[in-house]
Design a protein with these regions (language model features):
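Substrate/cofactor-recognition hotspot
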Residues: 2-194
Length: 194
């Protein structure tokens, strides 16, 4: 396997991959591990496959959910829920995700394809999902530069209030984090363990 350095696009898509699968910020340590895997030669879709094979994903995210409920859950990570998107748009995505699962594709590959699509020039009907994904990615990026948290509930809470109502810039993302008690640039102290 050839070694390479993760570029800015890889880094952005890594945040989005974690968001799509876990609806969470990665945190500093998890992000470093993911980028190290890319530096060792893994593609982002391979990283997605590795993430969807983790105990956290298989037990804490999808657990015992039916296929239909798994689809609904992953759709919610992109804001594709009632009140935030139209029924036709949700049906289109639901059918797409379900068909991909039935053909044997992994959640890692499906989410990778979804984030790549939303990061490009998506159909205008998915503009709000793209804005939400970008806003979450910016918040996750700023958060993960300062915080080493690895607890899934905490990492999900970081993004819980992010919306697609406005397009976030750096200042808006920092204000959001300040509002949830996670100011940008904070130094997080950790307790040493013997």
């Amino acid at each position: 396997m050839l070694s390479r350095m993760a570029n800015s696009s890889d880094i952005d898509l890594t945040y989005k991959l974690v968001i799509g699968l876990f609806n969470a910020a990665p945190g500093k340590l998890n992000l470093a591990a993911l980028l190290s895997a890319i530096d060792r030669g893994l593609s982002l879709s391979q990283v997605g496959d590795a993430l969807d094979s983790t105990v956290v994903f298989t037990q804490e995210i999808i657990g015992d959910l039916s296929e239909a409920n798994q689809v609904s859950l992953i759709m919610s990570h992109f804001g594709l829920v009632e009140g935030q998107s139209t029924g036709n748009d949700r049906k289109l995505v639901r059918d797409y995700f379900t068909e991909r699962l039935k053909t044997g594709d992994s959640w890692g590959q499906i989410v990778y394809d979804a984030i790549t699509y939303l990061s490009g020039n998506p159909d205008p009907r998915f503009a709000k999902a793209a804005v939400l994904l970008n806003n979450k990615a910016l918040v996750a990026q700023i958060y993960s530069q300062s915080y080493v948290e690895a607890n899934l509930n905490v990492l999900q809470h970081v993004l819980a209030g992010v919306s697609a109502d406005d397009i976030f810039d750096q200042a808006a993302a920092e204000a959001y984090l300040e509002g949830i008690g996670k100011p940008a640039g904070a130094v997080e102290l950790t307790q040493a363990k013997d």
